[in-house]
Amino acid sequence: YLQYTHMFREVDGALYVGQSTYGDLCMHASFATGLIGQSYPPEYSILPGTRLGYPFLVDALSATMLIYGTPLAAAFSVPGTLMTGLIWLGFVLFTWEMTGKKSAVVIAFVLLFFNGGLGFLGTLDRVTSDPTALNDALNGYYQTPTNMPDVNLRWVNALCDLLVPQRTLMAGWLCVLPALYLLVAAMRERRAAAFLAVGLWAGPMPMIHTHSFLALGVISLGAMIDCLLREKKRRLRTLLLFALYGAAACALALPQLLEWTFPQTVGGGSLRILFNWVNNDGNGGLKDEYFWFWIKNVGLVYLIFPLAALTIRKPAVKALSLGCLLLYALAETVVFQPNVYDNNKLFFVAFLAMLPAAAEILTDIYARLKGIRGRCVLAAAFILASTLSGAITIVREAKSEYQIFGKEQVEAAAFIRENTLEDGL
């Protein structure tokens, strides 16, 4: 539904988008339309002579559809809808591979796509003194309890603020979920072909979504370290298997990184040290107390992650837990792009990779409480506290509607496209 309403929906000749796509979609549209007829490697259409360093392959898909006559809205909404559905399916399969429990699959799915921290408490508190506060949350521009920078709520809802507007991230998750699935299977089977398959899948990822590629690499490094520490008798074989995976991935990825990523990140001065993400006040201090910042943003499940990592004995959970911890630490200390906020693209991969284990722990806790009166109430309270902020955000996003281009602007653009040369000035 959001892929339809938020992607240049035409109403009486004007084009409409949603709250979350009001900014991002125009950028992606400029990439998709600018790629048509370009030489290779492509350049920014608004900055001739400047190489397009942004991962552009998902927008190249829309560009191909435009070339074959697909309307602008459909060129974005159709692949977006298909990719979102595949991400849902991929996460379900990944969670099943990790847990083997239907209840854990349902819980993990709900916690990911209805995710939200404790921001709803602030909204409800404001309602007691100002009855219009709830109306603001449901109708105001970025007043939802998952994304309010003025009170340091920055974790956002994965569905509304990541998958719908951020098309490269959507494509990145489409690739990283199968990669994690293949990695877990490879660690279990210990066959060279399985590790080679992970590497061949991961290699093309940099120009699909560089952050997802980096996240997968760091998680894989942590998983390798865990395997080497636990399996002393077959360390050499383990090291060789992971080396095969890494060699295959690097052989495919390195040309992309050298051509696009490194010049923009290192040469552009984006790489720098910064502790605690957006909670850093820029003056050597923190806006909120460290753990409170994460608890109020991520929610109660943040407290479940270390419990899952420490108590579940499954080798795959142990391996991915160490990898996610390394990724979390890296994203907490190093910024890879001009906008500090975009490190959430790394945090969220660790988040989704740990959710299956967290969901399994929650099902185990519920089972251990059998016979205790009120366990259903406790479970419902946990789920409600973990999803209410996200639910409010989804309702608000579904209601949002903004005109991005008026009828006259659309007609002017069509006239220019039909009556000027492609290389005209």
Report the location of each language-model feature.
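Active-site lumenal/periplasmic loops and adjacent helix-entry segments of GT-C-fold
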Residues: 1-175, 210, 214, 399-403
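Hydrophobic/aromatic-rich transmembrane helices and adjacent perimembrane loops
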Residues: 81-84, 169, 214-217, 339-367
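Membrane-interface alpha helices of multi-pass inner-membrane proteins
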Residues: 160-162, 194-209
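Hydrophobic, aromatic-rich transmembrane alpha-helices
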Residues: 177-186, 219-225, 297-318, 364
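Membrane-interface helix-loop-helix junctions at transmembrane boundaries of multi-pass membrane enzymes
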Residues: 186-194, 229-243, 305-325, 368-376
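Transmembrane alpha-helix segments characteristic
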Residues: 193-202, 219, 242-247, 313-335, ...
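Signature aromatic-anchored transmembrane alpha helix within multi-pass, membrane-resident enzymes
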Residues: 238-251, 363-394
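Extracytoplasmic
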Residues: 374-425
